[in-house]
């Protein structure tokens, strides 16, 4: 039996809690340096950096699981993992329609950077990603299943 070292709850520079140094290449490179075999990107309410992290992970010989840390209407954080990048990006588009139009304030929450496949900044997310969606917790399991994914509560204290 092969054992894997993994981190299934990583944020990039897209998440308001992330640092601008948490670029796709840096995430994958550091994961390789510390001996991880598998990483999952779970930015807050977005999968927009998953394509770039998937490419960076492949370059470093890492397995990659696309994901998202979804904030429900009740402000519960749920980790959502997907079998494919396409499914994750489809889910991202769905969730985007359920986020409030609260603008990000970079001075307080950071820049929310989106990277392209060449590990360069392509744009910034203008809406604040740590806001709660209007999606109720009770609907998330079935919703994530529709996108060939699984969900796991992110924190034991909420």
Show which residues each predicted segment covers.
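An N-terminally biased module of ancient metal coordination in phosphate/nucleic-acid-related enzymes
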Residues: 1-75
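Extended substrate/RNA-proximal surfaces in nucleic-acid metabolism proteins
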Residues: 3, 56-158
């Amino acid at each position: 039996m092969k054992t894997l070292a993994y981190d299934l709850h990583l944020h990039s520079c897209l998440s308001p809690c992330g640092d601008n140094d948490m670029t796709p290449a840096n995430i994958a490179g550091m994961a390789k340096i510390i001996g991880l075999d598998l990483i999952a990107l779970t930015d807050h309410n977005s999968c927009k950096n998953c394509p770039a992290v998937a490419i960076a992970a492949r370059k470093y010989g890492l397995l990659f699981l696309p994901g998202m840390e979804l904030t429900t209407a009740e402000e519960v954080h749920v980790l959502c993992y997907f079998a494919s990048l396409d499914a994750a990006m489809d889910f991202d588009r769905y969730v985007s329609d359920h986020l409030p139009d609260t603008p990000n304030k970079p001075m307080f929450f950071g820049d929310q950077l989106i990277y392209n496949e060449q590990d360069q900044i392509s744009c910034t997310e203008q809406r604040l990603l740590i806001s709660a969606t209007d999606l109720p917790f009770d609907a998330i399991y079935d919703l994530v299943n529709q996108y060939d994914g699984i969900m796991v509560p992110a924190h034991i204290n909420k």
